[in-house]
Amino acid sequence: MILLVIGTLLVLWIFNQMYWRTRPYPPGPTPLPVLGNIHTILWEYPGLAPLNRWKEKYGSIFTTWLGSKPLVSVADYQTIHEMFVLDGDSYADRSAFSTFTEEYRGGILGIIETSGDVWRDQRRFALHTLRDFGLGKEEMQERILYETVDLLDILERESTSSGTVSPMKHIDQSVASVINLVIFGYRFDEQTVHELKRNREMQEELIIMSKNPLLMIPIAFPKMAKVWPFKKMKDGLMAIRDEQFAFFEKNIEIHRKRIDYSNDECDDFCDAYLKEMERRKDEPETSFHEKQFVNVCIDLWSAGLDTTSMTMGWGCIILLHHPEVQQKLHEEYDRVIGSDRLITTADKNDLPYTAAYINELQRYANILPQNLLRQTIKEVTINGVTIPEGTAISPQISVLMCDPEIFPDPSTFNPSRFIDENGKLISVKQLLPFSIGKRQCPGEGLARMELFLFFANLVHRFKISPSDPSNLPSLEKKFANVGRPNPFEVRLERRFK
């Protein structure tokens, strides 16, 4: 009798997990109990293939499950524009695994994870302060060009001495130096690069952990984190979290000890935030406090590094697979620049093929397999499909990037798709590497400037060749939250002696 009751309850639970709970949402693949559909994404990383299959089978609005959490995906441009631009307020909140996020971050904090007035205040302050420090202006260009020259010189020295060079660690250091200078006022040099190296090592450790689909269990069901082996998984995660936070807390404390609150001038973002905290300290509901500060710094620092650095890495690899594209870039530089001088943003309008290459690079590399999740603030109906209030929802930008109706023959790398018959750059509104709507990446301006200046000057100075022409670097993405290239080496030949 007991076994019969247990069996009946088990069947009912499985029925609820795989069918009953899915009824209020748009159709989608059947979720497994506990795991949902996360196993499919992990087994077919980066997950683009199953997303395309589900779009074809269920339509452009479909539901998948991240453990116990339903996620509605939107995978066509017209609907994405209607929802996230024309009706952006309805989808502006962030969706998260609340209990886990609160424990990992110390609360629902920062810019990425927050919603409502807190998110608006923090985002507004960050954007305003970044503009004050030269975002999109000549001052920021000078900082990036300084790092660009340093990067090119390091690559040239190492390539000359060793014959080949692994560019990713140097690209990482240069891109990280730009954002770290803005936030904390110093770049990563020989004395401080160990900090960046350790941050990268911790990120690799997190990536290894996240490959295990069982990690979703203590995240989705926090009480399970007290039970072995989930407790061990969570403890490992939190140990890395503590060390990561320590880097930011240390830098904030250094600034706090030396800051002069009577001086309105700020040397970096950290100074500006400390002074804003001081200005608002008597406000009872202020969102400018210590825990918020650390999380905002983490959000800005991470957003300012990963996507730009990884895109640069893919840019090098793709040139090795497409030497004819590199030849066209060199021809454009020889025609327009004509010397070994640095390329600046003043040259951008005269370098349409470079701009087209970067556009196609962002489309083809498609490094964000899953956009950060948003949340409906009310029940909504779109294209006849009703989505309940409080539902996680995401514009599937990665699916748009390989949609053959938008980009014919999407598996082919072709910068010329962005060039018209007169050799002018074509603006394609469906190209959304920085997302769309109210949650669009706040660092887009900085990232665009970095990609242009770093990349154009790299290819202008060097002919980039494979270390082994018979064994080109893989185009397979390494498992990560951002699609990373596998380690690779190149040969560099200076074009101007």
Q: Where is each model-derived feature located?
A:
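Cytochrome P450 heme-binding "Cys pocket" and the immediately downstream C-terminal segment
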Residues: 323-326, 444-482
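Cytochrome P450 heme-thiolate "Cys pocket" and heme-binding signature region
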Residues: 298, 421-451, 476-478
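Cytochrome P450 substrate-recognition site 1
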Residues: 21-42, 47-140, 166-167, 171-181, ...
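Conserved cytochrome P450 K-helix/beta-meander segment immediately N-terminal to the heme-binding cysteine loop
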Residues: 395-422
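Classical protein tyrosine phosphatase
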Residues: 25-32, 73-83, 92, 186-196, ...
